[in-house]
Amino acid sequence: MTIETFSWGIKVSSQPTEGSKDTVRKIQFGDGYAQVSGSGLNDEIRTYEFSFSGDPITANEIHAFLRRHKVKSFIFTPPFGDTALWRVEADTLKKVVKNVKVITVTATFEQAFAP
């Protein structure tokens, strides 16, 4: 199985946002002490808010690519970030037709740890 690569350029002017979701276990004791630990090997999942506005041909190519990757990983390198496996987070893919020359595609990518 070949893992596809997201090869479209990301415009930094669109102010892309990278975040993270942490999976931690916390036990609070009566004396105020708290014990905190990561939950599993991958206790931090990075997220990336993606947005593209542009010509309909490119927008539709991106939308089709992202539709294929809701449950299947792809390779992506965020601006100023590290190359990793990602997939489209459930229920976040959207396509808005602004006019005949501009379509906007948005989605949230979440880090994947296996294809």
From Swiss-Prot:
Taxonomic superkingdom: Viruses
UniProt KW keywords: Host cytoplasm, Late protein, Viral genome ejection through host cell envelope, Viral long flexible tail ejection system, Viral penetration into host cytoplasm, Viral tail protein, Virion, Virus entry into host cell
GO biological-process terms attached to the record: symbiont genome ejection through host cell envelope, long flexible tail mechanism
GO-annotated cellular components: host cell cytoplasm; virus tail
Cysteine disulfide partners in this protein: none
InterPro entries: Phage_lambda_TipM
Subcellular location: Virion; Host cytoplasm
Keyword presence, Membrane: no
Keyword field contains Translocase: no
Function: Part of the distal tail tip which plays a role in DNA ejection during entry, and in tail assembly initiation during exit. May bind tail tip complex associated with tape measure protein and allow tail tube protein polymerization on top of tail tip.
UniProt family annotation: Belongs to the lambda-like tail tip protein M family.
Name of the featured protein: Tail tip protein M
Organism this protein belongs to: Escherichia phage N15
Gene name of the encoded protein: gene 17
